[in-house]
Amino acid sequence: MSLLAGNAFAADSIPASLTGAKGDPARGRAIVANRQVGLCLLCHSGPFPEERFQGNLAPDLTSVGARYSEGQIRQRMVDSRKVNPQTIMPAYYESEGFARVAPAYRGKTILSAEQIEDVVAYLATLR
């Protein structure tokens, strides 16, 4: 069963919050910068002067809020394969359709709905 059953989708967007509420940008920034939780900076770079090593495999996050709506950011966080089937970005809020998942992680998402909304709220501020 999909975790997103009942959510409306636009072509490249999930317009509605996964939780029904706005996320917290400060918590979202902490998730993006945390190398144990989001791992975003493994591939992305952005406005994180305190982080020495940032990725160069994926787009810079500096102006992501100017390039995408909150719904478009949310879709890319939930499962960017819906937008780009060739992406290497993990699906942060899907729990099905993966190969070779360790037993402890089966049926679980990388981030919770609340964490997704926090990251969306933060990334939307990057203009």
Regions found by a protein language model. Give the residues of each.
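C-terminal capping alpha-helices of c-type cytochrome domains
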Residues: 75, 92-127
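Bacterial N-terminal signal peptides
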Residues: 1-4
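Gly/Gly-Pro-rich "capping" loops immediately C-terminal to redox-active cysteine motifs
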Residues: 19-22, 31, 45-79, 88-102
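Electrostatic cytochrome c docking/interface patches
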Residues: 11-35
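Sequence context surrounding c-type heme c attachment/ligation sites in exported
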Residues: 26-41, 54-55, 108-114
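The canonical Cys-X-X-Cys-His
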Residues: 28, 36-47, 73, 119, ...
